[in-house]
Amino acid sequence: MRPENYQARSQPPSNEFELNFGPNHPGIEGNYAFRVKLNGDQVLEARADAGYLHRGFEKLMEGRLWIQNIALVPRICVPDPVPMEVCYSLAIEEIGGLEVPERAKWIRVMQLEMSRLAAHLFAFGGHAATTGMYTTMFWGVADRDLILDRFEELTGGRVYSIYNIPGGVRRDVPEGFLDRLSSLLDYLESRLPDYDNLFFTNQVFVKRARGVGAMTQEQALKWGVTGPNLRATGLEFDVRRDDPYLVYDQLDFEIPTESGGDALARNLVRRAELKQSIRILRQVIERLPSIEGPIRCPIPNPLAWNVPAGEAYTRVESSKGELAYYVVSTGGDKPYRVHVRGPSSMHAVQVLEKLALGARLEDIAQIMFSLDACPPEVDR
């Protein structure tokens, strides 16, 4: 090789290069892509690349009857589909002036907290896998499957229950279901110390997660962070308590918080929420047998139901953060507009991009899993 073709000593080769995560990658949650520019193993630039799961949910809802969308909305967030059903139903009930029976409200709360338990177990498993702790992942999936068994008994569906409808729920609680749910809660509570020893207090995990993906409370509020990710910065805000819906104002529960604002704090908040969801479910199990009455209010023929003209903005607390629906009716048998304000829209795009800056390449996966984002919710 000629000497003039050699690179000058004053211009050493650059260590900067670009790397694509996903859309199929073990460190990515779901079909999602993340593009980073690196200097060695340090992230200089980060850009979320969504769209791999785009199915146009919001537009599809405009062409379907009000009742038909109940089968569509759970698919917006597969790990935690129940809040999607409930929030959409609450919006229709507000526009249509429907009064949901008391028993149906308690059943909805029961289903919401069961879904929260299942979603958090799923999140723990995914995060544990990014740090090589596959036993925690297997435990989380196995224990989540027991909750799905109860969903199947209650609703007929393990993942997509399609159980909540405008005006109430499809059917009542099966005989003996509350006893079986109570036994499951006893089992799950007995498992929490095992999860603590294996994962949450494991020094390998603690050292890997502490200080990773940290944000302050001011940053979290500026970036639109909600749910466990916001509470991990020390702000005690939860829609269930601060803007109560259904019967949450009749329940006794605490709002867990942490002050670290990092991946470890976010996981510890979700760990504490498991115990609070179990606490709520036990109150429902105790109260529900004494609450009699119908499980749904009368509505017109759902296949020819012209919901009165109006609009509604409703919100609930999902396992991933504040979920809201803005629904507009022009008096027809289909929605004029449905807008979903999902927490993952913020967490998986702008928050993830900002927290990745300056991080090491090996920590990108656990930053994403600690935010517990849901890609289909981004691509709605």
Where are these regions (language model features)?
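Active-site bordering "gate/hinge" segments
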Residues: 1-380
